[in-house]
Amino acid sequence: MKKILITGFEPFGNDKINPALEAVKLIAGRKLNGGEIVICQVPVVRYKSIETVKQAIEEQQPYAVITVGQASGRAAITPERIAINVDDFRIPDNEGIQVIDEPVVAGGPDAYFTTLPIKAMVSEIQAQGIPATVSNTAGTFVCNHLFYGIQHYLKDTNVRHGFVHIPLLPEQSVDGSQPTMKLEQIAEGLAIAAQAIIDNDSDIQQGAGTIC
């Protein structure tokens, strides 16, 4: 039985809710074909985010980890391709920390690629009628910080990891200015992604690039 650890961030900024946390709560304990989902709540705090997930990994000993965060402006579930070694926070984190152009890990590589089968994940999510696409930027806030930090932590292990950004919930954009997705659809997309990880030891060959 392969455990898939899926983490969700707490609310941050002016939001009272974070769809990442709410979605993972909905699928906590879900049984998969050959696996199960376990979850972890993550603080939107620079170094505490990494330490929290590291502790969950040590406790759960998962086969793979999906770290999840919200991304305003996105209309689809978007597995991230790459994490970069830069913290450049546009807003403070939840403890008031706001850093500019500092490394996530001093002396670390410029970037890490995901070790999840992101194209297979996207394909399986799309097959169920849920919008999904590969993303080539995880930003420079705590989402990318966590993505990079956990990739660095797991680099010499067989534990697979990657980050997935998800849209806002309808209640987070009552004026309709931002694309949204229903909570149940987000949760189901994450569960499908978890199953795709179990089913695919390597990624599929399928175009997912962009011009810019």
From Swiss-Prot:
Molecular function terms, GO-annotated: pyroglutamyl-peptidase activity
Signal peptide from the UniProt entry: none
Keyword terms: Cytoplasm, Hydrolase, Protease, Thiol protease
Enzyme category, top tier: hydrolase
GO biological process, one term: proteolysis
Cell compartment(s), UniProt: Cytoplasm
Superkingdom, natural source: Bacteria
GO cellular component: cytosol
UniProt cross-references to PROSITE patterns, sorted A to Z: PYRASE_CYS (PS01334)
Residues forming the catalytic site: 80, 143, 165
EC number, UniProt record: 3.4.19.3
Location (main, coarse): cytoplasm
Catalytic activity from the UniProt record: Release of an N-terminal pyroglutamyl group from a polypeptide, the second amino acid generally not being Pro
Family: Belongs to the peptidase C15 family.
Complex and partners: Homotetramer.
Functional description taken from the UniProt entry: Removes 5-oxoproline from various penultimate amino acid residues except L-proline.
UniProt-recorded name of the protein: Pyrrolidone-carboxylate peptidase
Protein source organism: Aliivibrio fischeri (strain ATCC 700601 / ES114) (Vibrio fischeri)
Gene expressing this chain: pcp
